[in-house]
Structures are given as C-alpha cells and as structure tokens.
Amino acid sequence: MKILVQKFGGTSVGTLERIELCAKRVIKALEKGYKPVVVSSAMAGETDSLIELAKKVHPRPPEREMDTLLAVGEQKAIALFAMTLNKLGYPAVSLCGWQVPIITDNVHTKARIRKIGISRLLSLIEEGYIPVVAGFQGVTEDWEITTLGRGGSDTTAVALAAALKADCEINTDVPGVFTADPRIVPNAKKIKKISYEEMLELASLGAKVMQIRSVEFAAKYNVRIHVRSTFSEEEGTWIVPEDEVMEKVAVRGITVDTKETRFTVVRVPDKPGIAAEIFKALGDAHIVVDMIVQNVSHEGYTDMSFTVNKTDADKAEEIVKKIAQKIGAKEVVRDDKVAKISIVGIGMKSAYGVAGRMFDILARNGINIKAISTSEIKISCLIDEKYAELAVRALHEEFIEEMEEFETINGKNKE
Amino acid sequence: MKILVQKFGGTSVGTLERIELCAKRVIKALEKGYKPVVVSSAMAGETDSLIELAKKVHPRPPEREMDTLLAVGEQKAIALFAMTLNKLGYPAVSLCGWQVPIITDNVHTKARIRKIGISRLLSLIEEGYIPVVAGFQGVTEDWEITTLGRGGSDTTAVALAAALKADCEINTDVPGVFTADPRIVPNAKKIKKISYEEMLELASLGAKVMQIRSVEFAAKYNVRIHVRSTFSEEEGTWIVPEDEVMEKVAVRGITVDTKETRFTVVRVPDKPGIAAEIFKALGDAHIVVDMIVQNVSHEGYTDMSFTVNKTDADKAEEIVKKIAQKIGAKEVVRDDKVAKISIVGIGMKSAYGVAGRMFDILARNGINIKAISTSEIKISCLIDEKYAELAVRALHEEFIEEMEEFETINGKNKE
C-alpha cells in the first residue's frame, strides 16, 4: 500500500472552488495508485479572524481557550474538503486531531507531537475511504485540544508521513524552492532536489514555502517532501536526505536578509566572561541574536559585533549601552542599514575556494564586507543594505547560472 | 454543592457584548452560592451560514461531515465564553461534547444522548472552574462527532442537569411561556409554573421558547427548568413535575395553529382496514397527520376528516384522491382556510364542563366548529381561519383573564 500524505495550505483551500481543485489533485493521486491521506489547513484568513475575535474579548486570552477557538478553522475546512470529495464520488472521512489521534504535550498554542495513532487511518484506507485530517491540531493525553503553532499543518503532514512511512506532498501557493528570491533575481531557478540541511539554512527562502520546524521533523525521520504548487501540474522541489541529493553543487541557493541591525561594541576588554555578560542580558530580554563576530584582540582589546532583528534593535541598544559602560568599552555603534547575504549548499563541505570566490565576486562589484560568519554549508556576509540586490544578483549569476562551469572548477579543486 | 446548569441560546450569545452579559449572569449565580455549569449554543446565524456553505458544496452533504462542520459553531462560542469569564476574573474552562463526554448513538444530525460522563465536570467545579459546555454536540463510542438536531442545546442542558441532579436555567430571548401569543392577545400573561405535560401540549407556544424534545427529556428525569430572558432580571416560567404545580387551573394556555389543511373523505364505506389504508399511505409518504376525526356511520358509510401541514397538502391530496377512488368514497374535500384552536391545562382532568364552556364561547361569538378532538389535558377545535384571532381572544378572556371567577365555578363543578 503506497500511502501519500497530501497537505493543502490555507490559500489552496481559500474558497470552495479551490477546495474542489485540491480534491481533484487528491483524486489524481488515487488514480495513480496512491492511497492519499489529506491534511488541510484552515481556509485562508480564518485563523486571523479568529485571533482578532479573541483579542476583542481578552487582551491575553488564556492559551487553552485560544487552542479550542483556533482548532475551529481546520475543523471547518476538513468537513468541507470531505464533502467535496464525496460529491466528486470518492468516499472521504474528516478527522480532527483528537480523532486520529495526534497526541501532543500540553504546551498550549505551540504543542509538540508526542505520538500518532495510525490504526484508525489504516482501517479507513482499507475500507476505501480517503481520510482528511485537520492540520495544526492535536490533543493531550488528558483530552485537551492543542495547536502546533503557526504553520503547524506542515508539521502535522510530515509527522503523519513519518508515522505512515509515506512521502509527503506539500501543496502550496508557490511552485517550489528557488535558488534566490525571484523578485530580486529574475533568473532564479526552481531547485529540483535539496537536502534538509540546505533547506534549513535557506530558511528565509524556505519559510515562504513551509514551516521550518516541519523540515527539522522530516530530517529526523527521513520523510521525503515534495513541495509544489496546488495550481499547476509541474513538479516542485523535493526535500530529501543528503545522500539522495546526487548533484552536490557548492551553492544551492542565495538568500538576503535586510531585517537585521548590527551593533558593534568597540574596544571591549578581551577577558573571559565579557561576551557571556552581553549575550546573557540579551537572552534574558528574549532578544534573538543572529550573527556574532569577534576578531582577534589587539593590546587586550577587541571589537565585538552582532546582529539582532530590527524590531528588537531599540531594546538591544539600551541593554548593550548599559553593559558597555559597565565593562569599560569605548562605545556602541549601531548600523540599521545592513543586509546579510548568504550562500548555502552541501557541496561546500567538500569544495575548496567557495568563500574566497564569494568575497571576490563582492569585491569586483565594489561591495565592502562588514562582517563574515560561516557554518559548514553556509557563508554569510554582512554588507551595506543598498548593495543587497546587486550582491544577490551577482552571486546568483556566478554561482548558479554558471553552475556547469563552476562544477568543473569545483571538480578540479577537489583533486 | 448546589449545581445550576445555565443554558444560553444563540441570540443570547449573538455578539461579544452579549456574551459578556451572559457571563455576568453566570457570575451572579455564582455569587448566590450556586456552582454554575454553562451550556452555550452557537452565536446567532453561525449554524445557518455553515449549512449554507455545505449546501454550496454538496446538495445532500454526508451527515457525518455535516456534524463535524456544524459542531464548529458551538466550539467557537464556548471558547469565547470561557475567555470572557476569565477576563472578568472567573476561571473557566470550555468543553466540547467529546471532552465532557456526552455520549450519543450514531444517528448523525439527530443523535440521542446515551450517557454523560460527569467526573470531569465535577472535578473542574471542585477545582474552582466554571465549565462551559458546547450545546448541541455529542460523540459516539467510536469517537465520531454527532449533533442533536436543531435546538439540541436545550437537550444538552437538560441532560446535564439530569446527570448532575441540578436545576436547569434556559436563558433565551423571550421572558417565559405565555398563556397565549402576545401578538394576538395583548393581555396574555406569563405563566409562573407549568407542568411538563402542559408545556408539551402547548408546543406551538412553547416551541418558540425551547425545544420540545428537551421537555420530554426533563419530564423523564424530573429536571426543573426555569425559562427566562437573558436580558432581564425578572423570573420567567418554571417547567416542573405536575405535583409541583399547586394551582391546577383548568386552562393554562391557548394556542392557535393556521398551518394546517383539512381533508374530508366523504361517504367512506365503514369497514375495517379503510382508515389504515389511508393513513398508511400518508405515513409512507412521510406526511405527518395531526387531527383525525371520524363520526359514527350512517347506513354503512362515514365521513373521515384529518389535517396535515399545509406544506404537505398537495402531496396528501394526490394520495388521498387515489385511495378514495379505490375504496369507493364519494369525494375528497379540501379546506385550506382552517385554524386549530386549542385550550390546554392539567386542571381539565378533574374539571367538568370545560369543553362545553369552550364550545359555548365560540358559539356566542358566531364561530362554527368544523371538527373537535380532545386529549386528557387539551381540547382542540377546527374553525374557519378568519375567526382564529377572535376565537383566541374570546377564549383567553373567559378562561384566563377571568380565571378567579372561573376557578370558583370550577370548584363548584367539582362538587
């Protein structure tokens, strides 16, 4: 029995007409010999309007009740989805999270899945029904309704696929994952296959496509994901284990992030505990720090730079200025006009010269690098915001559009 | 522990402002020393718009999916209700039908309650929470969502009250049950106490107030019901066991029904099986027959009259004409312009002369009686539709407004 979990996002089920389109895609999978298990989000806009309603009642609605309220959106969608399949002549049965059951911990509004019962799903499939499961919802061991956090339907789909040992199809409103944001780089290409790790590092590209937590989940259980457009028959992007990505190009994609602010604490005494003091204070204030760069020290002093999300910048500035004074740093410099450009690819692990090549491309285009940070499969450079698009286009042209040429060089380098 | 089940109908929870009003009524009960258990309907209009949506998808949506869809309305309402209580400082917890659980049979869209778990409710109450239960919903032993049919929230409330051995308060948009329709009889009075039997016979008055099935349920388990307006502090009408209705007046209320059509099958051969043939055919066509009147026969022939709902009249006419021809009746006469006037009261059981007095009042007002039918606590007369309002007013004036005088007569009659 070849089960296929097919997930449809909020835009895909946004109207009754669109639900019918989705249902037809399910029927197509059935005709190809798959046993489909549908996972549906709430119809586009429903969740937002429920949240708005709750906020009118209570500035901070109890999270338990919030979950009960929000679960309504998916319940409505699955009933309509199942009705549509029935109308088209295919017996279908909707299941809420508690009916599957999808058992979670009891952290309301951002619960984690603990286990999934599959016997009911399997017997429905054997009896010839198409199960239509509510995304986003779960139930605790104590019969409390929980939800999995924004975009949680992706996690539902991946978890079901893991439990059923099936592939997972994510039907959404974009055709797949691209090598760069097509609005910036018109030549951006759809990626055919990408590893979980690459997908995670390409978060800023991928987040528009699917919830990052669900990719982590897929990586953990080796669930193969096919992200594709609900509104087209084209193949999308497969997100798969690393060993399945045959073509290990050095650079899979290029991202740009202009939502960060850089701070530099100038002339910090270079002694143990200083970094800890700064970042502990930021952590206590629930500020997420992204890049952290510290150079070698000169004469017992160093400069320390880091970036935070722009929305946290004012709070961060206040905190850091206080600490800077306390530890005797010279000053704190704030720079809001920065962009973080990253290149990502598992090929990097075994390819020499990728970083140097990146710096060279930026230099040739007259772009100064303000900070560098690297991981195994990602290199990020902080640059002046006004060069962001230019940088992405230049990097895309040389790393991706001239890929064949690069791969030869890469091959040579590997010798 | 003095538990009080407080049910709020759709209009009562129709807006967030109204939900707050309802929540305040719950808090008032709490302050009076009650432990309230709230039952809420869906916000006014929700259920209808969900049905409309389903009809757009499927001309006859599968009933199982219909239940899953409709259950959404109450789930939304209870979450908002519980949030409101929390905002006002009173910890509350919403419970869907399956969370209570309210176990039903598996007849989707009109399920019957089989049993109710009360341990979760009791421990919530003991921990200081106000449980807010979704009306209208249940769950089968197989974890299928069911609904109890239109107005099913009343049944939920009465069943919970029965299980918890509590009184049941029905908060609605009318102040109680009246002796007649106040639009016809401006002097109609609110009834203070009425027996289950009277309430059932006054269906046409009572149906605007609460679901008839829930009254049957209350009668079976002796649940005392207090029907009152959500928007007023006044006492409403208590629906109670017969032995609690101290004041056994002959006539508790007067109803009029103009939604029926009368048929008379003229000169029917008076032999066994004829009546059965007519009414079996109507039953097979799912036509509900109300009054049936047959007089003594003359020379082997009799006339047989019955009434059906106007919406079924055309279908009934076709069926009856066929059978009339077959059994050799003379003709079938149809009369659409009839009204059924009924007087109801448990006092009738022990009071002589009530029927005669009713006929006399009608005669004095020049109203001809076309058919009569009686039960232990109800007398119905079919009259010309144009006299309907006149008849109700005249009967109300003499039986209800002049009640004291009547009771003296009644007392005399009983000697």
From Swiss-Prot, chains A, B:
SUPFAM superfamilies: ACT-like, Carbamate kinase-like. Keywords: Amino-acid biosynthesis, ATP-binding, Diaminopimelate biosynthesis, Kinase, Lysine biosynthesis, Nucleotide-binding, Repeat, Transferase. Pathway: Amino-acid biosynthesis; L-lysine biosynthesis via DAP pathway; (S)-tetrahydrodipicolinate from L-aspartate: step 1/4; Amino-acid biosynthesis; L-methionine biosynthesis via de novo pathway; L-homoserine from L-aspartate: step 1/3; Amino-acid biosynthesis; L-threonine biosynthesis; L-threonine from L-aspartate: step 1/5. One of its GO terms (biological process) is threonine biosynthetic process. It catalyses: L-aspartate + ATP = 4-phospho-L-aspartate + ADP. GO terms for cellular component: cytosol. GO terms for molecular function: aspartate kinase activity; ATP binding. The keyword Kinase applies. Disulfide bonds: none annotated. InterPro entries: AceGlu_kinase-like_sf (IPR036393), ACT-like_dom_sf (IPR045865), ACT_Aspartokinase (IPR054352), ACT_dom (IPR002912), AKii-LysC-BS (IPR041740), Asp/Glu/Uridylate_kinase (IPR001048), Asp_kin_monofn (IPR005260), Asp_kinase (IPR001341). It is an enzyme of class 2 (transferase). Its EC number is 2.7.2.4. Residues 263-337, 343-415 form the ACT domain. Belongs to the aspartokinase family. NCBIfam families: asp_kin_monofn, asp_kinases, PRK06635.1-2, PRK06635.1-4. This is Aspartokinase. The lineage of its organism: Bacteria, Pseudomonadati, Aquificota, Aquificia, Aquificales. The gene is lysC.
